[in-house]
From Swiss-Prot:
UniProt keyword list: 4Fe-4S, GTP-binding, Iron, Iron-sulfur, Lyase, Metal-binding, Molybdenum cofactor biosynthesis, Nucleotide-binding, S-adenosyl-L-methionine
This enzyme's EC code(s): 4.1.99.22
Name used for this protein in its record: GTP 3',8-cyclase
Cysteines engaged in disulfide bonds, as pairs: none
Residues annotated for GTP binding in this entry: R16, R65, T96, K157, R259, L260, R261
HAMAP family xrefs: MoaA_B
Catalyses which reaction(s): GTP + AH2 + S-adenosyl-L-methionine = (8S)-3',8-cyclo-7,8-dihydroguanosine 5'-triphosphate + 5'-deoxyadenosine + L-methionine + A + H(+)
Coiled-coil residue spans: none
PROSITE patterns assigned: MOAA_NIFB_PQQE, RADICAL_SAM
Residues covered by the Radical SAM core domain: 7-240
Residue sites binding [4Fe-4S] cluster 2 per the record: C254, C257, C271
Function noted in UniProt: Catalyzes the cyclization of GTP to (8S)-3',8-cyclo-7,8-dihydroguanosine 5'-triphosphate.
Length: 326
């Protein structure tokens, strides 16, 4: 099998596939004013999703994560899961969700073939959760995480965007929460975007602060599998849960990059903070275009840069994280 490899010998096993940029939350670090449609958009159809996922599978992709926006806003979300999972080469099919539909739908997603779930929970304080997300749905999301375990998921990942003077002093509360639960809690450093410069300057804090606290408390870093995301994961014998740290401003963060992104409009993005994407959609209309689609993906990858330029304050075309799913 051909394996996607770039000019810096990095191998790519992981595709983050956005299926919508619509979201019903108004998170302060992403869409503080809520989702505002910019004209009429036509997101990838079920057939187009099938074709792009199949092409990446033929290029060695083992893991696909469905992102948004909020992926479950798609009425055909369960069908999307089932369609991708028909391909045995895709060993892991994950979703990142705000969790508001978990209680109702997670068992159905599991039955359709979903293998992994990430849920965004930036605070364990219901009032602060409401303030961050613009939605009074903390308890509904918590019930949804329980529903995921009931549906048969043996682990749930929970994402929390780390923000100074918001949740950076809540480590002990989060640790108490995951001690009896098989939850991998992932602290994600706040990243600068085109629309979020002021927020970044006010609230960014390095994940290294959390890492130092974990090491002092006896947590140990574990090795990463080839299709894992960018988190540094820590475990402790006294805890069922784990802690992950995603620190894009850390030296050599990009050296282990193993993932590519396709937007809900069918553009290939080589980096979350890259420039204009490469269109794939004109090659998603027919199965007969598969060879040409594969060739375009391979050719485009050779232009991927060695690193992002966040340290220079350059966030590329990413205006907010709903744009291509973070």
């Amino acid at each position: 099998m051909v394996q996607l490899t770039d000019a810096f010998a990095r191998k790519f096993y992981y595709l983050r596939l956005s299926i919508t940029d619509v979201c019903n939350f108004r998170c302060t670090y992403c869409l503080p004013e809520g989702y505002r449609p910019d004209g009429v958009k036509s997101f990838l159809s079920l057939d187009e999703i099938n074709r792009v996922s199949r092409a990446f599978a033929l290029l060695g992709t083992e893991k696909i994560r469905l992102t948004g926006g909020e992926p479950s806003m798609r009425r055909d979300f369960t069908d999307i899961i089932a369609t991708i999972r028909q391909n045995p080469a895709i060993r892991t099919l994950a979703v990142t969700t705000n969790g508001y539909r978990l209680v109702r739908d997670v068992a159905q997603w599991r039955d359709a073939g979903l293998t992994a779930i990430n849920v965004s929970v930036d605070s364990l304080d219901p009032r602060q959760f409401h303030a961050i997300t613009g939605q009074d749905k903390f308890y509904q999301v918590m019930q949804g995480i329980d529903a995921a375990f009931d549906a048969g998921f043996d682990k749930v990942k929970v994402n929390a965007v780390l923000m100074r003077d918001v949740n950076d002093r809540q480590l002990s509360a989060f640790l108490d929460w995951i001690k009896p639960r098989p939850i991998q809690l992932r602290f994600i450093e706040l990243m600068e975007t085109g629309e979020g410069g002021n927020l970044f300057r006010k609230h960014h804090v390095s994940g290294g602060v959390i890492r130092q606290q974990l090491l002092e408390q006896g947590w140990q870093q574990q090795d990463r599998a080839r299709s894992d995301g960018p988190a540094q994961v820590f475990h402790h014998s006294d805890y069922q849960g784990e802690i992950g740290l995603i620190m894009p401003y850390e030296k050599d963060f990009c050296a282990s990059c193993n993932r590519l992104r396709v937007s809900a409009l069918g553009n290939l993005h080589l980096c979350l903070f890259g420039e204009q994407g490469i269109t794939l959609r004109d090659l998603l209309g027919s199965d007969d275009q598969q060879d040409e689609l594969i060739a375009r993906i391979q050719s485009a990858l050779q232009t991927k840069k060695q690193t992002h330029f966040l340290h220079q304050g350059n966030s590329g075309i990413t205006q907010n994280l709903s744009f291509i799913g973070g």
